[in-house]
Every structure is written in C-alpha cells, then in structure tokens.
Amino acid sequence: MAYGIVHVFPGGTKEQYDASVAAVHPSDGSLPPGQIFHAAGPSTGGWTILAVHDSQESWESFRDGVLLPQMQQGIDGGFTTPPEETTVDLYTLQQ
C-alpha cells in the first residue's frame, strides 16, 4: 500500500530545502528507492514537503538509513530543526 508523508518545517526556506534534498536524494536528480512522488514548496510560516513511497517499509528504510543519519549529522545550509510530520496509509493514488 502506498504511504504518504507530509513534512512541515516552520520557518524553513527554499535554500534550506535545496541543501537538504541535495544531501539525501540521489545526485542524478532521481528519487530515492521506493519513493514514487515528491513535491515541495513554501507554505504558511515555512516550507512543506509531500512525499509518497510505495510502502511504509520503503519510507522507514529511507528515513532510518539516509534521512535521519544525515539530519542528525547536520546538513550544511539545511533545515536546522525536525519537521512536523503527518503520515497517511494511502487508500487511493492516481497519477
């Protein structure tokens, strides 16, 4: 089942987003394994990222193996605080 993640970074900026994505996504511009959708943009009071993975397991693998270690290590110019997170077991996904 597809799995959706919404991250809201209060006070986040485009520059922080660009630095963070450069650190955790493949350098060729593709999506991480298992991620099938990614969108981001400015939102009220910060920056929001929407991602869809092909399963909760692929999200957890990316989160635990790539995202959290990079963020805990610190990303030069990246987001400085953890996001507000909402996750969704997606019933419907149309492309």
Show which residues each predicted segment covers.
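Short S/T/G/P-rich N-terminal loop/turn motif that feeds into the first structured element of a domain
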Residues: 1-50, 54-69, 77-95
